[in-house]
Swiss-Prot record:
InterPro entries: DNA/RNA_pol_sf, DNA_pol_Y-fam_lit_finger_sf, DNA_pol_Y-fam_little_finger, DNA_polymerase-Y, DNApol_IV, PolY_HhH_motif, Rev_trsase/Diguanyl_cyclase, UmuC
Cystine crosslinks: none
Organism in which the protein naturally occurs: Streptococcus pyogenes serotype M12 (strain MGAS2096)
EC numbers, comma separated: 2.7.7.7
Annotated protein name in UniProt: DNA polymerase IV
Top-level taxon of the source organism: Bacteria
Gene expressing this chain: dinB
């Protein structure tokens, strides 16, 4: 007996785009000498006394069992010839924005999940293209031609299946899951591959003798609810390829910010003000991209001793003017008590956001 009726909207056309080893791929693109070599984004343990973790790595490094969140020390032990790169997150964010602009050519219904992946609803796309597969191929082509990177794409009628499909063939793959193929596709998947099913849930499912999508399909809804509560309701539907979650292009952003951590501490006011300027310009650009304005400017300062100060100023009018943001953030810094310790982190954030208003001056 079903607790809730099964409603399966199969009319949508959803694409999930996942960049291939994104950070490492950007570094390889910008330094051809790295091609074909194991590249790890993370601090070199030989320079940090073994401290640090792997942010990500390329496919060559993955052959040695290296993966995200592994300690840099273990990564080095697995592959002493690996090339460690601390990473340039400002550059990665810039590339990520370039990719999102490509998405927007095809649809405004884009839900970024992180800097390197997003869902797109192309049911009613800007170009009137009926085939979601064709759009996915065009996006892959545009990203490769304009950005010099590859991505994997999953196409289906909901986000859950599109996400699984993008993981199915990497790198630079494209997998389509039609409604008539969904049950067969899911039946063969190990339960740990199901997006949204965490490690503890996998262990519990294994204890119940459930190892694949086929196993999960055979379990009554009430049994899953008894074991997992509300999540059991979701599991029952996942096994049947049912997920009506919309692509949320209208996520409410509460703030837009930019911050950087410095390996070399900042002491000189000229250097500090220069970094505040960079962050302010970054925030202004992000406000422009997201068609937002803000009133409250927040400066975050973290010193060498990890003392962290946060101070904000609310303006009388909305703005996204880079010079104004820089001026206010600089004034906030000037108002702080002097601290002889060097600065290890600076951040500028805009809050109290509102959508762009046509009659407000937006000059950057």
């Amino acid at each position: 007996m079903l607790i809730f009726p099964l409603i399966n909207d199969t009319s949508r056309k959803i694409i999930h785009i996942d960049m291939d080893a994104f950070f490492a791929a950007v570094e390889e693109r910008d330094n051809l000498a790295l091609k074909g070599k194991p590249v790890v984004i993370g601090k070199d343990p030989r320079e940090t006394g073994g401290r640090g973790v792997v942010s990500t790595c390329n496919y060559e490094a993955r052959k040695y069992g290296i993966h995200s969140a592994m300690s840099s020390k273990e990564a080095y032990e697995r592959c002493p010839k690996a090339i460690f790169i601390s990473g340039n997150y400002e550059k990665y964010r810039t590339v990520g924005e370039q990719i999102r602009r490509i998405f927007k050519r095809y649809t405004d219904v884009v839900e970024p999940m992180s800097i390197d992946e997003a869902y797109l609803d192309v049911t009613n796309n800007k170009l009137g293209i009926k085939s979601a597969v064709k759009i996915a191929k065009l996006i892959q082509h545009d990203i490769w031609k304009e950005v010099g990177l590859t991505c994997s794409a999953g196409v289906s009628y909901n986000k859950f299946l599109a996400k699984l499909a993008s993981d199915f063939e990497k790198p630079h793959g494209l997998t389509l899951v039609l409604k008539e193929d969904a049950l067969c596709f899911l039946a063969k998947l190990p339960i740990e591959k199901f997006h949204g099913v965490g490690k503890k849930s996998v262990e519990k499912l294994h204890d119940m003798g459930i190892y694949t999508g086929q196993d999960l399909l055979a379990v009554p809804e009430m049994t899953l609810i008894d074991h997992f509560g509300r999540f059991g309701f979701d599991l029952y539907r996942k096994a049947r390829g049912i997920s009506n979650s919309p692509v949320k292009s209208d996520r409410i952003r509460k703030s837009i910010g930019s911050e950087r951590t410095y390996a070399k501490l900042l002491y000189q006011e000229t250097d500090i003000k220069a970094e505040i300027s960079k962050n302010a310009k970054r925030v202004a650009a992000l406000l422009q991209d997201h068609k937002k304005l803000g009133k409250t400017i927040v400066l975050k300062v973290r010193y060498a001793d990890f003392t962290t100060l946060t101070k904000r100023v609310t303006l009388p009018e909305l703005t996204r003017n880079a010079a104004q943001i820089e001026q206010v953030a600089g004034d906030i810094f000037d108002s702080l008590s002097e601290n002889p310790a060097g600065i290890r982190l600076l951040g500028v954030t805009m809050t109290n956001l509102e959508d762009k208003v046509a009659d407000i001056s937006l000059d950057l």
